[in-house]
């Protein structure tokens, strides 16, 4: 269980980011420096 908090580092294969709309975003083309710091477009927290 558990989830990764906003702006904490993440890997797309492990725990999900906290919040339904929050996604793990990698800041380099080769898939490193990934953080839970993006939200899905047109997504609302329910």
Curated annotation (Swiss-Prot):
GO cellular component, one term: extracellular region
Subcellular location, principal: secreted
Coiled-coil parts of chain: none
Keyword tRNA processing set for record: no
Domain of life of the organism encoding this protein: Eukaryota
Tissue-wise expression: Expressed by the venom gland.
Intrachain disulfide bonds: 3-18, 10-24, 17-36, 21-43, 26-34
One of the record's GO molecular function terms: toxin activity
Keywords on record: Disulfide bond, Ion channel impairing toxin, Knottin, Neurotoxin, Secreted, Toxin, Voltage-gated sodium channel impairing toxin
Record's subcellular location: Secreted
Protein family: Belongs to the neurotoxin 02 (plectoxin) family. 02 (plectoxin) subfamily.
Additional observations: Shows very weak inhibition on rat Nav1.4/SCN4A sodium channels (23% at 50 uM of toxin and 35% at 100 uM).
Domain notes per entry: The presence of a 'disulfide through disulfide knot' structurally defines this protein as a knottin.
Function: Competes for binding at site 3 of the insect voltage-gated sodium channel (Nav). Insecticidal neurotoxin. Causes temporary paralysis to lepidopteran larvae (10.3 nmol/g) or to crickets (doses from 0.93 to 119 ug/g). Is not toxic to mice when injected intracranially (high doses).
Protein name stated in the entry: Mu-hexatoxin-Mg2a
């Amino acid at each position: 269980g558990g989830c990764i908090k906003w702006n904490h580092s993440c890997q797309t294969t492990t725990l999900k980011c906290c919040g339904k709309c929050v996604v793990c975003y990698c800041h380099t083309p080769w898939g490193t420096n990934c953080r839970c710091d993006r939200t899905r477009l047109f997504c609302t927290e329910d």
